[in-house]
């Protein structure tokens, strides 16, 4: 029941924040114009990531679990939201984005202990253990997911829909 409540609050607060932040973004010029791989029509406010992160954070707070287990994830997500907003406002170089994505992934893996330790039984010969490659592999996976999500954001709501 607690999980359903937390998910409901996360969804409702994210949706509400999108509506509120949309007006703010249009007012301050935090918008994306169509062109290139971006197929949307008109200027689109760039606030989906901030709204979804905030909604997720509200939901996590309602779980009443020890927040220490979420600290590294929340810090990494907050860093990515900040870097994404800075990139949307002023444009960061691909190298700078890669560095910050790596820092966020390392926050989760090194500080939070989150990682892919084994790949399962891929070859039918037993579990493939990553050992000392677990952190580098996880960092590469996280960076890959971040960039795949970013690349899918050329159509209105596609990245947000995939994330949900």
What name fits each language-model region?
Residues 1-164:
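"…together with the soluble PPM/PP2C metallo-phosphatase catalytic core" -> "…together
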């Amino acid at each position: 029941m607690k999980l359903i409540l937390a998910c409901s609050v996360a969804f409702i607060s994210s949706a509400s924040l999108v509506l509120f932040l949309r007006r703010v973004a249009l007012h301050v010029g935090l918008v994306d114009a169509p062109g290139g791989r971006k197929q949307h029509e008109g200027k689109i406010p760039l606030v989906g990531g901030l709204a979804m992160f905030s909604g997720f954070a509200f939901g996590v707070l309602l779980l009443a679990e020890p927040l220490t287990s979420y600290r590294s994830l929340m810090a990494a997500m907050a860093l990515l939201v900040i870097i994404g907003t800075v990139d949307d406002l002023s444009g960061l170089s691909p190298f700078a984005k890669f560095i910050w994505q790596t820092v966020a992934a390392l926050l989760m893996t090194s500080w939070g202990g989150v990682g892919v330790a084994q790949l399962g039984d891929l070859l039918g010969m037993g579990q493939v253990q990553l050992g000392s490659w677990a952190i580098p592999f996880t960092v590469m996976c996280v960076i890959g997911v971040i960039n795949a999500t970013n690349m899918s954001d050329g159509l209105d709501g596609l990245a947000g829909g995939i994330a949900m």
